[in-house]
């Protein structure tokens, strides 16, 4: 019935088939419905041939009853080029709804066969019978007794018969939607644009675009509507001035391209509006990347004052960031050489600010063990030869060794008597199973997170604070028993700031308490 054109290549066909598989837009119709669909395409294809051919072989078939259709066809030039990759869901959903109308019209007013490409006066479907797409598609059942459902293979065979000529689809689009212009009067947008063809369909696109630039006498404005799950571009109005098309690139950007028409007086006005719309559309964010990343654009808006200011601001920001880094490096070097007291005060205040920020950050992290793993890799390396000129107390900050659990709330001091101060806190007596369980968990991970602490407290019938303190004491004893001197401790001892070998009273008390706990647990 239809002849496969060269411009409808295998890539376009495979993409159409894949889209149909994903959208299931034709699978709900039977073979008879698709046959009527192809017949409907055949009628409009004859209209297309009548309009584009120079001979008047089809002119005799149009009588006075179809003079209105003839005038509309002659008035509508092929202004819009359908893109076979992006706009396919539009015409598929629109034409499948037109099948319902084709079923009724073929039984009453048409007498065509699937093997012929010519028609009589009764074979032309009038424009009044075409309908606009709706959100509800109800397939019409024919009078045939047996109807088999469509399969993917049958669908491929039927699609291969369709003469995918872009002028034909543009003609069908206009004949279907122009007469319904009044129903979308509230949605007319002067800045919305019609679509252009992709670079894949080379031969048909070049010929159609040339005819578009020479024969165009009206401006078609489009707006997007969502019908049947697809974004449908509906024609809203037409005017005798210019055609504005939209060019799509691989980077999913959209650029407005002006096509010259007969009226050249409004060219500057449309170009000025086009540049303004581009600036508003991209929100000044992606404007600087247009001329660098996408070379397919015809116009370049990098010379716009808004874009120039944006580029200058980016350069200024880069320069200020670089200058701040250089100033920080110079300040560190000067302070290391001159031991400036003002610099030391500044670093102390900066350390305090960093300490607060790190405490707030550690609150958000749920796992204490994860915090330790992250911070252990980010510790200040005192063995670095480039940092040996710094004093050792710079590294002796709380957040550089291990992050804290957050800022502590200081409770107001209560007046206590001397007897209460002399009383020691009650010692925790752990049982043997409790000590074994705690030791096992300590071997797995020396640091507790909140979930493990709660789980251990419930299993061992202890308070969370008791479990936490036991882990703290165990870590301290393990570190003391290893006997390994920290590099930072050696530096501090060399400078005479602190002697780590001296045992303070708190350590002695902890050892005595642990030994007493072990003795009581063994007796029990």
Curated annotation (Swiss-Prot):
Q: Which InterPro entries match?
A: Engrailed_Homeobox_TFs, HD, HD_engrailed, HD_metazoa, Homeobox-engrailed_C-terminal, Homeobox-engrailed_CS, Homeobox_CS, Homeodomain-like_sf
Q: Name one GO biological process term.
A: neuron differentiation
The UniProt keyword set, sorted, is:
Developmental protein, DNA-binding, Homeobox, Nucleus
Gene3D superfamilies membership: Homeodomain-like
Tell where it localizes: Nucleus
> What GO cellular component entries does it have?
nucleus
Q: Where are the residues of the annotated region Disordered?
A: 194-218
Provide the residue ranges listed under DNA-binding region in this record.
423-482
Keyword Nucleus carried by entry: yes
- Which molecular function terms from Gene Ontology are attached? DNA-binding transcription factor activity, RNA polymerase II-specific; RNA polymerase II cis-regulatory region sequence-specific DNA binding
Matching PANTHER family, A to Z? HOMEOBOX PROTEIN ENGRAILED, HOMEOBOX PROTEIN INVECTED
Family membership, please give it: Belongs to the engrailed homeobox family.
- The protein's name: Homeobox protein engrailed-like SMOX-2
Gene designation per UniProt? SMOX-2
